[in-house]
């Protein structure tokens, strides 16, 4: 017998009710569901509801809290657990509260219901991977540590920032450049990473820097029937071919397994603009005098940005071929180097004790981790690294398909719970770390 639409809806409702009842048995999971159910998707994230929820959690954990608006209606929450030696550089656990938009009809479960599939324990929701999981895992780890009367030596800050998904300019960027941040004397930041389809966690020490390139070609206009040199279209096509060859050379390195995705320069054409519009389409018997193309480029800090810029000026948009170019990202050019000319990355060798502490803590929780990687896209961690503060990208999600920004984003219940255990181990290791780091030495010099 066919089931009617209302019948289906009723069944769905019953299913949701059942899954939330099941979850209610586990307060940890039910808190995660509550956070996921707050719709903080762009373009109109409900930040205030998220703030209320986080603040109520902070209160239950007796953490000090403050809400700061670096931009109107874009609240950032800063929680504090004061250490026994607050003069030591502190630990910052960062996460963003916003999520990317959804196309609900393409989801198997409603994206803000946080329904649990009872067959396998998967929790479906936008933000389940990116990155409400991490934000609440920090808090759950703190809850457990407090229950066992753990007392941190170093002060622990937990920040919940807005707007990461739209560039972080009114969130982490303003925060990292604020007096509030300076006063926190942060020694290490933990921020987001990516899920890993295999059993090893992924750790990120840097990220690629976005560079948006627009190249423009000019040439004499002419009749569509005429063959002549140096048309705008021909000039642009030569450049596109050159860019395409470069892209293939980089992609081949990844395909051959010689480099990871984050270690090569990616170049992707994102628009192509040319032609003379007519009421019915385009004028067909006219060769246009202008043509342009746009490219999204991502450069790892281990690449030679200056040589890429030379390649752009000499090969991709040479003045000799009547070409010009604009380089930018959010109207300003980004660089893989900081103001002192050093590549923006966090050391992942013996010179950075935090890295060894992190690996040791993961080891202790009986989990594996892979080779340190460069994050292929951008996260808020870059703003902290730019300030010279080490930042490690890590989201404890192994055996999980990468579904950030995708339909049917989910995280398994057991994987979420395991992640809390791992953060307990990390926070314990970081907050108990008594030895002096380079930053500690510098702080002492100032005193
Ligand atoms: Zn994210």
Provide a role label for each language-model segment.
Residues 5-23:
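Cleavable N-terminal signal peptides of Sec/SRP-targeted secreted and luminal proteins
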Residues 123-136, 165, 230-233, 410-417:
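Short, conserved micro-motifs enriched in small and acidic residues
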Residues 33, 55, 136-139, 143, ...:
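Predominant activation on well-ordered alpha-helical scaffold segments within soluble catalytic domains
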Residues 122, 129-206:
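Acidic/histidine-rich catalytic neighborhood of metal-dependent amide-processing enzymes
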Residues 41-43, 72, 85-86, 97-101, ...:
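Solvent-exposed loop/turn segments at secondary-structure junctions
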Residues 2, 22-128, 135, 139, ...:
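Acidic/His- and Gly-rich active-site-bordering loop/insert found
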Residues 23-27, 65, 85, 194-199, ...:
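Metal-dependent amide/peptide-bond hydrolase catalytic core
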